[in-house]
Amino acid sequence: MALSTEEVLAGLAELINDETGIATDSVALDKSFTDDLDIDSISMMTIVVNAEEKFDVKIPDDEVKNLKTVGDAVAFIERAQG
């Protein structure tokens, strides 16, 4: 069963918190990974790998560059889960 947007957001917020220390309540759909959350490319790749494991999805490297906001990542994960 696919997770809800809120469940994916909460799970992604936990992964971001684990990697960067950013408070989970600071992670919102409209937040930019680079501009708002100041996540660098190395941390982003770690978050992507952990998200692939947590949500059982594959995020191709060429798609990662399209994930500008948390909402972009949540939408991608939702689509990938079917």
Protein language model features and the residues they cover:
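Residue-level recognition of oxygen-bearing side chains
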Residues: 8, 32, 50, 69-72
